[in-house]
């Protein structure tokens, strides 16, 4: 009993966590790319430890796709590519990756990081519902632009294009990932022809404040009108945050599971009205012509 108590002291828990971090770093050395990163930014710090930003979610996404028996081929499009984290990851599974990033600082790093793979093409433009010049507001403490947003009232000059007008690819489009800080609906309105012809999976981030009080979400409603009738979302117990209402013991049990490596990631496929109104690392929209292929994991 005494020995068991010693093993559960804070110092031993810290050692177990340190071993997990070292194991991840060794895996990164053996498999993950040597990214050029922007120091002290959230995405960069995660890449240093995990090898990729959102590595667990991306790995699980590929596992889920394979579980469906879906072939990873054709073109993946990365809209809001930032420094290239998702682009480089997708390049290892798809025949071609097209990366779009309007922020000139992020694009500088994207251009270098994309050279790590031979099948990535990069474009220093943003995707919108019209072809025009605009501005990008970049926070002073976030030069990489994770919190940047498009503005009509000054900022860094950028070019916006409609994907329908810009795109030329010899491969079928299998996946479109969109992460552009609340500008997703504008981007989708400029790619109706692409979505109608290719019917790709659409992977997009959603913030809690993008859900209305009645649970409705403008992006999800728009995609539903285009024939996207099923949506998959991730439940990652490793990133669950407990409020005070959930109690002391819930937090302790969650902490113990994390230390023992027992936390799980799950993927749920549901209707548009059943998606929890909270922050989502990504939601996957599935076209009705492909629905029969997908299931929970």
Which residues fall in each region the model found?
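S-adenosyl-L-methionine
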Residues: 1-113, 117-119, 152-156, 166-171, ...
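Short internal loop-to-helix segment that lines adenine-nucleotide cofactor pockets
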Residues: 49-77, 133-135, 142-198, 210-215
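A short acidic, amphipathic alpha-helical/loop segment
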Residues: 89, 93, 187-194, 218-222
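Short, well-ordered alpha-helix to beta-strand connector turns
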Residues: 94, 227-228
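Core alpha/beta nucleotide-donor-binding catalytic domains of modification enzymes
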Residues: 104-142
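Conserved beta-strand signature within the Rossmann-like core of class I S-adenosyl-L-methionine
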Residues: 199-206
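Active-site beta-loop-alpha junctions enriched in small/polar residues
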Residues: 207-209, 236
């Amino acid at each position: 009993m005494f020995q068991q108590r010693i093993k559960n002291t804070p110092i031993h828990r810290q050692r177990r966590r340190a071993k997990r971090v070292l194991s991840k770093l060794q895996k990164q050395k053996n498999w993950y790319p040597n990214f050029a990163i922007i120091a002290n930014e959230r995405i960069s710090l995660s890449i240093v430890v995990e090898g990729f930003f959102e590595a667990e979610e991306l790995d699980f996404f590929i596992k889920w796709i394979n579980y469906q028996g879906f072939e990873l081929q054709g073109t993946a499009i990365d809209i809001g590519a930032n420094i290239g984290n998702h682009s480089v990851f997708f390049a290892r599974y798809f025949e071609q990756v097209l990366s779009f990033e309007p922020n000139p600082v992020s694009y500088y790093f994207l251009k270098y990081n994309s050279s790590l793979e031979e099948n990535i093409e990069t474009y220093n433009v943003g995707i919108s519902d019209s072809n025009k010049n605009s501005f990008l507001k970049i926070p002073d403490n976030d030069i990489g632009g994770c919190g940047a947003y498009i503005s009509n009232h000054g900022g860094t000059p950028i070019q916006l294009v409609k994907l329908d007008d810009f795109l030329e690819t010899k491969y079928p489009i299998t996946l479109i990932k969109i992460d552009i800080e609340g500008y997703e609906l504008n981007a989708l309105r400029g790619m109706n022809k692409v979505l109608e012809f290719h019917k790709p999976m659409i992977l997009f981030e959603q913030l809690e404040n993008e859900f209305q009080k009645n649970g409705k979400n403008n992006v999800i409603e728009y995609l539903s009108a285009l024939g996207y009738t099923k949506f998959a979302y991730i439940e990652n117990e490793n990133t669950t945050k407990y409020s005070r209402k959930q109690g002391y013991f819930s937090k302790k049990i969650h902490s113990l599971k994390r230390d023992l490596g027992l936390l799980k990631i799950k993927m749920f496929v549901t209707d548009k009205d059943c998606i929890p109104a909270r922050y989502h690392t990504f939601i996957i929209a599935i076209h009705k012509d492909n629905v029969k292929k997908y299931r929970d994991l």
